Structures are given as C-alpha cells and as structure tokens.
Amino acid sequence: MQRLEPWHGHCRLQFSTNDGGRTRHQGGCRAPFKLLRAEAGDDGRCELPLLHTAGGLVGGDQLSIDLNLKAESRSLITSVAAQKVYGSVGRSRLNPDGAWSRQGVTCTLDDNSDLEWLPQEMVLYADALFHQSLRVCLPENASFLSAEIVRLGRTAAEERLNQGCWRSCLEIQRHGA
C-alpha cells in the first residue's frame, strides 16, 4: 500500500482598513487550505470563510494559520464545515505511538482591532491523535472572541475516541493590562 505524504499547509493573512472603514485582507494559503470569497459585514467587518479541502486530518498532518489584524480592523474567520481528525496513520500494537496531527493558530491584533475566530465543530474519530494550539496577542483596547465545539468520537455511530488523544493549548497575552 502506498503511503501518502502528510499535509504541511499554512494560511497567512493580514487585515487592514481602507479609507471607507472597511476591512480588507491580504495574503494567502497553501493547500489544503483555500480562502472563499470574503464578505463585508454591515459594520465593515471582513467575514472570511476558510476551507480545508482535504476533508480532514490524518496522522502527521501539520497546519498553521497566522492572522495579523492592523489597527482599527475587524474580522470574522470561520470554517466551511466541521474539522474531522481521523485515526492516526501507522498506529498499531507494534507502534502504539502513531503519528500526531497538529494545528497551530497565531493571532496578532493591533490597537482597536477586533477578531472573531469561530470555526465550526471538530470531530475526533476513534484513535485520533491531535494537538492544537491557539495563541493570541492583543493590546488592552483590542477584542477577541472565540468558541470551540469538540466531539470525542462519532457518538451517533456509537464510536468512541478509544486510544485517541486530544491536546489543546490556549494562550492569550494582553499587553498593557
């Protein structure tokens, strides 16, 4: 059986406001990420859906997302569908460690910026190994909103996480507070 190379995708985006007060984005993504069309909210916020085209993560996949909001910019970043994390590649009784999937998100906000990071739910399949980190750096006058929904196993199919593991690290650094 042919073994496929893991994904090493990244997305780097910068948000800034124009003279009319609307937030625009620059930057781009490398597969398996794809940006869909950004919409402007009533308040000038850039509403941007992010698509993971591979359909899910398997052991060894490495994803990184870097978001940089310049002063006065506002953005809502969401995902198009649930993030699926499948069982680890190469995991067996002989190799119980398997390979971890990883996703790191770094958000850097400048003065008076506002970021809403609201991806759809994440489903960890049986025996998935997943490590995620979310790091946010923001000044006292900026705001950040996030929520996370995680399902451990596909419970409707009576599947459990079993020997899987989910590690999540959240770091928020507030300057001037």
Question: What name fits each language-model region?
Answer:
Residues 70, 110, 137-139, 173:
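Feature marks extracellular polysaccharide-active and adherence modules
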Residues 67, 112-113, 147-149:
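Solvent-exposed loop/turn tips at the surfaces of repeat/solenoid architectures
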Residues 114-115, 142-144:
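Repeated loop/turn-to-beta-strand initiation elements of outer-membrane beta-barrel proteins
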Residues 1-100, 161-177:
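Terminal catalytic/cofactor-binding subdomain
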